[in-house]
Amino acid sequence: MSIVFSVVRSRIPSHYGHYNHSHHPHFEDLVVKPLTNILPLLTGFTLLAGVILLIHISIPQAEPYTSKFLFLSHRQPSTGLYSVGDGDVCFVLFEVLTLAGLREGCMKYLLAPFARVMGVSKERKVVRFSEQGWILMYYSVFWPLGMLIWAKSPHFSDMDQLWIHWPQRDIDGLIKFYILTQLAYWIQQVISVNIEARRKDYWLNVVHHFITITLILLCYVYHHTRVGSLILVMMDAIEILFPFAKCLRYLGFTTLCDLVFFLFFVTWIVSRHVLYLMTCWSVYSDVPRIIEPSCFMGSANDLHGPLPVPDDWWHLIEPWIYPKGKVCHSDSFRVSILAYLLLLQVLMMIWFGFICKVAIGVLDGRAAEDVRSDVESDEEDSEPVANGSGWQQSQLQPGRRVGSNGAAQMVDGVKKDLRCNIHCNEE
């Protein structure tokens, strides 16, 4: 990139001598260096987002098309609410591109310099701090937003309201923005986990991310956004505390890290094993009582139904293609949603078992270790030891596997990941 600016500057004097940078000694510092730092971000996903925004601003004729990427679509003028439509795909795509750029920019130009200023010296730890810092920044915005939506909703104190008056074809703009942005975030996470160097918990992350994306899509397309937003709020509660604890660990605030870990432990139980299972129970017991197996057709202002559920598979596909077409609720759909939720609960129960061991260790005076999927061991935190092959010495210890594939890799990775370190004390 700097070569491009050098070429541009070398050609300026031949035609516009009064712009010669030699007459402006601060040209390099004021213009070239900032641009060479910023423009590398405008690559890949971020470049596409920038192009869409530029077209929207500069070409008025393109606004009907580009506005779908920049703003929520399918607003109903009579009510001010929003419906589901194909424009949502464009909005989510732009959100994915934007989040990818924000993640890269915040990590590289905000969080990494902050870590170095605070005394984090090893580059690997700087990267890990930046990754956790970005997660903390994101959820510091979207978890309170989700809590606000939940607190203002009728199902805050009555879980029956999660299912009453289904289907809600139109939803509030804030809820739509929240759901679609969360969907974009998890899609961006899938991209990130495949761009970065693979960790031992790669397959666990992939499975978790795809289950989350599937649940968000099912809740949105089949008009169950109330329960979808509630599940996101419950799952996201610890996504602030966990990266916060890890950031404190990297910065050396060991006592505060232990306190945050205790808060994390309590929040995990309440959000992921009490409220979450209450929601699963509501899916199991309340849904059959409140929602009869039936179908509806048309927009919110022209809704027809209830209609009988067809025997074919087309009624499951139709909402994805025709948002105002037939949408059905059946017992098989309820069981599918419940199965996804319980699969996540199984993963969380496994994690919680190891979290309990960590908590016992903390009470015994040992270093706190967390067991989330972002793996960090002492071996990974240590500096590489040259051995002539490019591998770290720790990777070549007897009994350690340097590679595997398929299900064996996933199982082996899970066992190691759930024993990973989040030491609040640096050794």
Curated annotation (Swiss-Prot):
An annotated GO cellular component: membrane
Induction: Induced by exogenous FB1.
Domain TLC: 124-364
UniProt keyword annotations, A-Z: Endoplasmic reticulum, Glycoprotein, Lipid biosynthesis, Lipid metabolism, Membrane, Transferase, Transmembrane, Transmembrane helix
Entry keyword Acyltransferase: no
Localization per Swiss-Prot or TrEMBL: Endoplasmic reticulum membrane
Name this protein carries in UniProt: Ceramide Synthase FUM18
Species the sequence originates in: Gibberella moniliformis (strain M3125 / FGSC 7600) (Maize ear and stalk rot fungus)
Highest classification ranks of the organism: Eukaryota, Fungi, Dikarya, Ascomycota, Pezizomycotina
